[in-house]
């Protein structure tokens, strides 16, 4: 057999941007306990430390323990005020939650003012993308193992009280997520 020489080939460079696809996105300030919550809800093993921006890349976990369905949860790095304008690598972080179906707003009840935290976080989401404020939202008040968090919880009934560190309230949160995703599937 004899092969004939082919024609010169083409060469091109492409830059692809990967955006995570997950069912649920955990959104909150640095040190709100998002990575600890991901670990409590799934079998994921993200890096956890008590300094801001421990999480620099999104972490994924699959929640399925004893649930009628399984779903993927994305823990994105902490959002700070000005994130939608690129402050603190905010745009790099926010783009990952655009493709989630449901947002879980994680607020540190031990240290933050829940109303102000929610205002800032939802404002950053709205400034980044028109589609993000339209997504279903579950509010979580984290760090309920601390006395100062419990004091605030009674005044803020719209939040599911959770302690990611002790797993208190995680079953209620998983049930709320499952119910919301189920309603969305039926719609």
Each PLM stretch: what is its role?
Residues 1-83, 87, 91, 95-97, ...:
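Conserved G1/Walker A P-loop phosphate-binding module
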Residues 135-138, 145-187:
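Canonical P-loop GTPase G-domain recognition
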Residues 99-120, 131-133, 144-149:
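Conserved Switch II/interswitch segment of TRAFAC-class P-loop GTPases
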Residues 89, 93, 118-129:
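Conserved catalytic-core segment of NTP-binding enzymes
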Residues 73, 106, 140:
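Generic enzyme active-site microenvironment
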Residues 21, 62, 77-80, 108-114, ...:
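Conserved nucleotide-binding/hydrolysis micro-motifs of P-loop NTPases
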């Amino acid at each position: 057999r004899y092969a004939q020489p082919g024609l010169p080939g083409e060469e091109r460079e492409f830059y692809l941007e990967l955006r995570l696809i997950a069912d649920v996105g955990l959104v909150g300030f640095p040190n709100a306990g998002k990575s600890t919550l991901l670990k409590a809800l799934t079998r994921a093993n993200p890096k956890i430390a008590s300094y801001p921006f421990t999480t620099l890349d999104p972490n994924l976990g699959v929640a399925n323990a004893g649930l009628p369905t399984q779903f993927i949860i994305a823990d994105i790095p902490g959002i700070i005020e000005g994130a939608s304008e690129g402050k603190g690598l905010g745009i790099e972080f926010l783009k990952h939650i655009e493709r989630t179906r449901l947002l879980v707003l994680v607020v540190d009840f031990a240290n933050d003012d829940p109303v102000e935290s929610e205002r800032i976080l939802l404002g950053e989401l709205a400034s980044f993308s028109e589609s993000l404020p339209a997504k279903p939202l579950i509010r979580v008040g984290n760090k309920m193992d601390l006395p100062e968090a419990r004091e605030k919880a009674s005044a803020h009934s719209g939040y599911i009280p959770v302690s990611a560190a002790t797993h208190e309230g995680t079953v209620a949160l998983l049930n709320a997520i499952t119910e919301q995703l189920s309603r969305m599937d039926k719609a």
